[in-house]
């Protein structure tokens, strides 16, 4: 029965111990039913004629004005999901109370009250109140901090609005929560769909709907109004839904639903109680908590049986066992975890690192492999157009002008290469090209083709398709080349020439993009991917992206911190190897994407662990490498900012992106860097390890202290004719000890504890308990002997003196263990605790010594200790600290120290 109760309780512990932002991406939405009325509404919107759409939403092609926006927002509310709305304070208070430890204490308190032990019930109630209120305060602070941090990296949408009283309109970038039904927005590759939308115009628009349907392949969307073949709105060509992402193409669409009224919003409301799979951090906390609770559930009955059998007073034995159970309950664990993580998140924000999910901090500190892209991480992210040449390597204005037309007229996601082409073309040429050539159509970029095309016209008779992209992908659709002004077949001789020229450019560290063209008769209708065939290779544009000055020292710092850096790039292996060499990273054997496709999972996992540089990768290659590294037991971080990085960001233990990343990358990430730099990342890793170290201190102290206390209680219960300490004493001792732990999140951490990755190790915790728990028992038994034979407190009439003596020793030794276990060094000499922790422990020790002498002593059934007791007290504490230090030295040499 007990096992079933606590199994249910513990199941909800991880989410209660850690404040997690209720992000919609975390919800499990597949196969969840929405109201029939919503399905009918969506199907109606899917086929509604455009003219009727304008009337339905009281909008117009020029966009909404400010008054219309405010009216729509008043009617429909903000574009936020219900889960994102703040809960009332009393809901937060209940959530902070509702953890297994507080529930357990409440049960014990109720038993005490029922047995008329009112003082014990009051002390237990006070402990629950302190734990709940401290946790509530820390949750409120962490929520406030998380909201402030999220506001720094909010996603935006491009919307068409009327911008002045004259009725002039323009495209504005606004936060997505400001969208209202009737807004017209632009979509491009990499965008998160910010609301439910009806497509008005689309060009090769492909959307990933896995968050709603579970289907991994993207689906094509279009502006057709034909009757849908299915009754499922998700299969309608004209509708896009909040929470999905644009994989490729462009579109304009009207917002038809926002917030809770969206398909995703309805699903989110119905799955808010569903349990998501706990991550490594939550599993670690859960295992530790379950271990401590099971330990208490086993030992409390044992104490009851021994005391009841030896003393004959089963009622008193039951009260004592109850107090032991309270003492073994680590009710401050939720508060310690929450406050430590929240403090870590705030400190990380000062290092330009924004934490989206608080429990990601532990994975940050545990990370031992960092996979990252090359561009903007190792390099300056300021790409410069260095060369524009024909296939022989001679400068060619024709190639530059073709590249300019492609970059200028494409409406998709303009990357740094496009910007470099536009900036690398002189203004006069740009004006001339813009006046002579008009855009007809475009075929947007996607990561399957790795190229994009625009169709332009200089006259009414012919169209010209201009295509640029990765060299191999362009060669795959070329049949001819322009060589010395003539069009010749693309044969083996030309291919060898092309390889020779491009390899030379790559070895110089230049990134090569191919440019090809095709002349076509003028025609009506859209151009498709099939038109990218029989192209003429015009030449290449080559870009320079020099390494950052901070990259080399950052890589050295990461290596010194025990983190292996691996480069996963879609770029050429020659360019990537050149950059690696310049920043002091030994690339060694380079693995390219085509090689990966021929390897089994086991072969690739083996290769991934010993390989530093992977080149010419697709998004799926990156995701597979990250997944296999995790399978081999590594804690893997992935840093990326592009659409192609999103799968790997989700697969990694910790996804890291930057503030300027595309929406889908920022949404997939756990950590957002305000500055795209490995040096900033290294500082964040150190702070993550510091945060984890402080959490681990409390867990180790609690586990070892509880383990030792139980041994002491069992020995005393078996051999003493009276209780070694009254239930009341145990409760007060536990309460004072809890107060001393409040400052642990603010403690200092030794340098050696942050020099290597830190991760949960349940085996180490069990070993730690066995080594350090019995130390306190040894000195507890010495105290028993001292009080029995030296002070002759060996009869029921003198038991108050005995209990007072052990009360003081127990409280002081339990408080001092904080300073002994917080460091592997010699405490107070080689390593000092932070001043808040020092102050709290000193106050608790003074209170503990003073209680037997205070007016409360008689009420607490304590008595003043003789002055001759205190030299013995000093000797016992000194011996305790000395032995602990000796055992600590042996333990750290043999097993290491977390």
Curated annotation (Swiss-Prot):
Sorted UniProt keywords: ATP-binding, Cell inner membrane, Cell membrane, Magnesium, Membrane, Metal-binding, Nucleotide-binding, Phosphoprotein, Translocase, Transmembrane, Transmembrane helix
Record-linked SUPFAM superfamilies: Calcium ATPase, transduction domain A (SSF81653), Calcium ATPase, transmembrane domain M (SSF81665), HAD-like (SSF56784), Metal cation-transporting ATPase, ATP-binding domain N (SSF81660)
Residues in the Extracellular compartment per record: 116, 309-317, 716-724, 791-799, 852-866
Record-annotated disulphide pairs: none
Residues annotated as binding Mg(2+): 331, 641, 645, 709, 734, 738
Induction data: Induced by low levels of proline and by osmotic shock. The leader of mgtA mRNA functions as a riboswitch, favoring transcription under low Mg(2+) conditions. Under limiting proline levels the MgtL peptide encoded within the mgtA leader cannot be translated, thereby favoring the transcription of the mgtA ORF. Induction by osmotic shock also depends on translational regulation by MgtL. Induced by low extracellular levels of Mg(2+) via the PhoQ/PhoP two-component regulatory system.
Pfam families to which the protein is assigned, alphabetical: Cation_ATPase_C, Cation_ATPase_N, E1-E2_ATPase, Hydrolase
Entry annotation: catalytic residues: 373 (4-aspartylphosphate intermediate)
Domain of life: Bacteria
CDD domains: P-type_ATPase_Mg
Cytoplasmic side: 1-94, 138-287, 336-695, 745-766, 819-831, 887-898
GO CC, alphabetical: intracellular membrane-bounded organelle; plasma membrane
Catalytic activity: Mg(2+)(out) + ATP + H2O = Mg(2+)(in) + ADP + phosphate + H(+)
A molecular function (GO) term: ATP binding
Gene Ontology BP annotations: cellular response to magnesium ion; magnesium ion transmembrane transport
UniProt keyword Phosphoprotein, yes or no: yes
Subcellular localization: Cell inner membrane
Control of this protein's activity: Upon Mg(2+) depletion, MgtA is stabilized by interaction with MgtS.
NCBIfam families: ATPase-IIIB_Mg, ATPase_P-type, PRK15122.1
Function (record text): Mediates magnesium influx to the cytosol.
Family per record: Belongs to the cation transport ATPase (P-type) (TC 3.A.3) family. Type IIIB subfamily.
Name the record gives this protein: Magnesium-transporting ATPase, P-type 1
Organism: Escherichia coli (strain K12)
Gene giving rise to this polypeptide: mgtA
């Amino acid at each position: 029965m007990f096992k079933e109760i606590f199994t249910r309780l513990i199941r909800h512990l991880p989410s209660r111990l850690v404040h997690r932002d209720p992000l919609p991406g975390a919800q499990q939405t597949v196969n969840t039913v929405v109201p029939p009325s919503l399905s009918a509404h969506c199907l109606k919107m899917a086929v509604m004629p455009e003219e009727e759409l304008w009337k339905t939403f009281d909008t117009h092609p020029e966009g909404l004005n400010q008054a219309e926006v405010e009216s729509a927002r008043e009617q429909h509310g903000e574009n936020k999901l219900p889960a994102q709305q703040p809960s009332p304070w009393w809901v937060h208070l209940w959530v902070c109370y509702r953890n297994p430890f507080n529930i357990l204490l409440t049960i014990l308190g109720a038993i005490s009250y029922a047995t008329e032990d009112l003082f014990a019930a009051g002390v237990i109630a006070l402990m629950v109140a302190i734990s709940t209120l401290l946790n509530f305060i820390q949750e409120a602070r962490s929520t406030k901090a998380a909201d402030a941090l999220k506001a720094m990296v909010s996603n935006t949408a491009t919307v068409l609005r009327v911008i002045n009283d004259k009725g002039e309109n323009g495209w504005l970038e606004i936060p997505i929560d400001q969208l209202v039904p009737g807004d017209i927005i632009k979509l491009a590759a990499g965008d998160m769909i910010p609301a439910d939308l009806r497509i008005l115009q689309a060009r090769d628009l492909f959307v990933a709907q896995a968050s709603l349907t579970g289907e991994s392949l993207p689906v094509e969307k279009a502006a057709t109004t034909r009757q849908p073949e299915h009754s499922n709105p998700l299969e309608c060509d004209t509708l896009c839904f909040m929470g999905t992402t644009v994989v490729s193409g462009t579109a304009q669409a009207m917002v038809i639903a926002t917030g809770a009224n969206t398909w995703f919003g309805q699903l989110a409301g119905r799955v808010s109680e569903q349990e998501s799979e706990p991550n490594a951090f939550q599993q670690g906390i859960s295992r530790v908590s379950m271990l401590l609770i099971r330990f208490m559930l086993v030992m409390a009955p044992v104490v009851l049986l021994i005391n009841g059998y030896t003393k004959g007073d089963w009622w008193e034995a039951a009260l004592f066992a109850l107090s032991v159970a309270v003492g073994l309950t680590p009710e401050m664990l939720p508060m310690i975890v929450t406050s430590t993580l929240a403090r870590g998140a705030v400190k990380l924000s000062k290092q330009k690192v924004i934490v989206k999910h608080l429990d990601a901090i532990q994975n940050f500190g545990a990370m031992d492999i960092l996979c990252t892209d090359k561009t903007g991480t190792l390099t300056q992210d300021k790409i410069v157009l260095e060369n524009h040449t024909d296939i022989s390597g001679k400068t060619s204005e024709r190639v530059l002008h073709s590249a300019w037309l492609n970059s200028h007229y494409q409406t998709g996601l303009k990357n740094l290469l496009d910007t470099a082409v536009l900036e690398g073309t002189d203004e006069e040429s740009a004006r001339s090209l813009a006046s002579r050539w008009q855009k007809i159509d475009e075929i947007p970029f996607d990561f399957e083709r790795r190229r994009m095309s625009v169709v332009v016209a200089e006259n009414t008779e012919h169209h010209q398709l201009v295509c640029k992209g990765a060299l191999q992908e362009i060669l795959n659709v070329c049949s001819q080349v322009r060589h010395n002004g003539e069009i010749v077949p693309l044969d083996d001789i030309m291919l060898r020439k092309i390889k020779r020229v491009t390899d030379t450019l790559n070895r110089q560290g230049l990134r090569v993009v191919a440019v090809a063209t095709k002349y076509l008769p003028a025609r009506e209708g859209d151009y498709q991917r099939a038109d990218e065939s029989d192209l003429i290779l015009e030449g290449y544009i080559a870009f320079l992206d020099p390494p950052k000055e901070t990259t080399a020292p950052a890589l050295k710092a990461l290596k010194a911190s025990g983190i292996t850096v691996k480069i996963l790039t879609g770029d050429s292996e020659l360019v990537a190897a050149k950059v690696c060499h310049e920043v002091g990273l030994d690339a060694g054997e380079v693995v390219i994407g085509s090689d990966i496709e021929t390897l089994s999972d086991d072969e690739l996992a083996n290769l991934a662990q010993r390989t530093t540089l992977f080149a010419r990768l697709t998004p799926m290659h990156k995701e597979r490498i990250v997944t296999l590294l995790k399978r081999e037991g590594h804690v893997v971080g992935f840093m990326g900012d592009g659409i192609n990085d999103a799968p790997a960001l989700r697969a990694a233990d910790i996804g890291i992106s930057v503030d300027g990343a595309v929406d889908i990358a920022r949404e997939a990430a756990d950590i957002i860097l305000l500055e795209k730099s490995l040096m900033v990342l290294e500082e964040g890793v150190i702070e993550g390890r510091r945060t984890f170290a402080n959490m681990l201190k409390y867990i180790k102290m609690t586990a070892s202290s509880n383990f030792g206390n139980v041994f002491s209680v069992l020995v005393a219960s078996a051999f003493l004719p009276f209780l070694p300490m009254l239930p009341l004493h145990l409760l007060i001792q536990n309460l004072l000890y809890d107060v001393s732990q409040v400052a642990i999140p603010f403690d200092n951490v030794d340098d050696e504890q942050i020099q290597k990755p830190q991760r949960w190790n349940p085996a180490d915790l069990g070993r730690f308990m066995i080594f350090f728990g019995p130390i306190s028992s040894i000195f507890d038994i010495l105290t028993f002997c001292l009080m029995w034979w030296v002070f002759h407190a060996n009869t029921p009439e003198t038991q108050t003196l005995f209990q007072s003596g052990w009360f003081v020793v127990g409280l002081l030794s339990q408080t001092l263990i904080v300073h002994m276990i917080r460091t592997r060094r010699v405490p107070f000499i080689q390593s000092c605790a932070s001043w808040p922790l020092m102050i709290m422990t000193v106050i608790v020790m003074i209170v503990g010594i003073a209680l037997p002498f205070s007016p409360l002593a008689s009420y607490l059934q304590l008595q003043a200790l003789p002055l001759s007791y205190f030299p013995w007290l000093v000797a016992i504490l000194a011996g305790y600290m000395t032995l602990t230090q000796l055992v600590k030295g042996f333990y750290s040499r043999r097993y290491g120290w977390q």
